[in-house]
A protein has these predicted regions:
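Blade-edge motifs of beta-propeller repeat domains
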Residues: 4-21, 53-69, 101-120, 152-170, ...
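Short, conserved, GDST-rich strand-edge loop motifs in beta-rich repeat architectures
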Residues: 193-203
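Beta-propeller blade termini
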Residues: 24-31, 72-79, 123-132, 152, ...
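Glycine-aliphatic tripeptides that mark coil-to-beta-strand junctions in extracellular
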Residues: 35-37, 83-85, 134-136, 184-186, ...
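Blade-level signature of beta-propeller repeat domains, shared across WD40, Kelch, NHL, RCC1
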Residues: 239-249, 253-281
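Hydrophobic beta-strand segments that make up the repeating blades of beta-propeller
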Residues: 39-42, 87-90, 138-141, 188-192, ...
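A short loop-to-beta-strand structural motif that recurs across blades of beta-propeller domains
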Residues: 1-3, 48-52, 96-100, 147-150, ...
Length: 281
């Protein structure tokens, strides 16, 4: 992994650090509470997580976590409410989320494993407070299940509810959340990637969908049917990948920024109707 240090807006080469096989995701958190930003690297090829400790800009391997099959992503949060930053790891081939708790010094131990729907092949994992009850929740994009799964945080910290599965369109691959309709509950944007197949061709394409919250029942958010939107105005080959929600033009409305890797472009969708917020009120 290559490190680039920023000095007054100019980046310089700070060397290379060896990590696991096929690193696919990188996250920056302070896992040892020394105010320096450390690094978490997800290695898909050897089912591991590399923990890189930051000592005043110099990184060294702190530990390697052995995790489930085909890890794709981590998200961080204080799952057990002890003021230390913990990890959730998405193991796609196992259809599970692993919860790893931090002792405050950067030592992680696996506390629980949350199963998702069998054969759903989740591709993305995000965290947030979906029902705005003060507990951090999790959500996965279930690529083969054509659904998203919501895992609601509990007062015990490392445990989550059984998944609430919401059926949506084909091939959900990535997620983002915000309160678009200002109702005090979190909504979702989903990037769909799928093949359009005819007798003569098979084309990787896609679109995006928006799920708006409608109510809460027994602690779970009830959502309206998914609204599907084209990712761009181009007619072919536009499967979106990552999603960023921000007020890009400072008009107090939430906009969408989508990466389109096949087209080597970014798409910007102006949020003309959404004056919501990025987090719970």
């Amino acid at each position: 992994m290559k490190l680039l240090l920023n000095s007054s807006g100019s980046f310089s080469d700070n060397g290379t650090i060896s990590v696991g096989d096929i690193p696919v995701h990188l996250e920056s958190i302070d896992f040892d509470n020394d105010t320096d930003s450390d690094l978490i690297v997800v290695n898909r090829g050897d089912n591991s997580i590399s923990l890189l400790r930051n000592d005043s800009g110099s990184f060294s391997e702190n530990a390697t976590l052995s995790v489930g099959n085909t890890p794709l992503k981590t998200v961080s949060g204080d799952w057990d409410n002890d003021s230390n930053t913990d990890l959730a790891v998405l193991a796609s081939a196992d259809n599970t989320i692993e919860i790893w708790l931090n002792d405050g010094s950067g030592n992680f131990s696996k506390a629980s494993t949350q199963p998702s729907s069998s054969g759903s092949s989740p591709r993305d994992l995000i965290s947030g407070d979906w029902n705005c009850d003060g507990y951090l929740d999790l959500a996965t994009a279930d690529y083969l299940g054509n659904s998203i799964s919501l895992f609601y945080g509990q007062s015990s910290g490392a445990d989550f509810s059984s998944p609430q599965t919401i059926s949506i369109g084909k091939g959900p691959a990535s997620l983002a959340s915000a309160d678009f309709n200002n109702d005090g509950r979190m909504d979702f944007v989903i990037a769909h990637r799928f093949y359009y197949t005819t007798s003569s061709l098979s084309l990787l394409t896609g679109d995006i969908g928006i799920l708006l919250s409608e109510s809460v029942s027994n602690g779970q958010v009830v959502y309206t049917s998914e609204t599907r939107l084209a990712a761009t105005t181009e007619s072919q080959g536009t499967p979106p990948a990552d999603i960023l929600i921000q007020d890009l033009d400072q008009d107090s409305k939430l906009d969408l920024l989508l990466s389109l890797p096949i087209n080597q472009k970014l798409a910007v969708l102006s949020g003309k109707n959404y004056t919501g917020s990025l987090n719970c009120p």
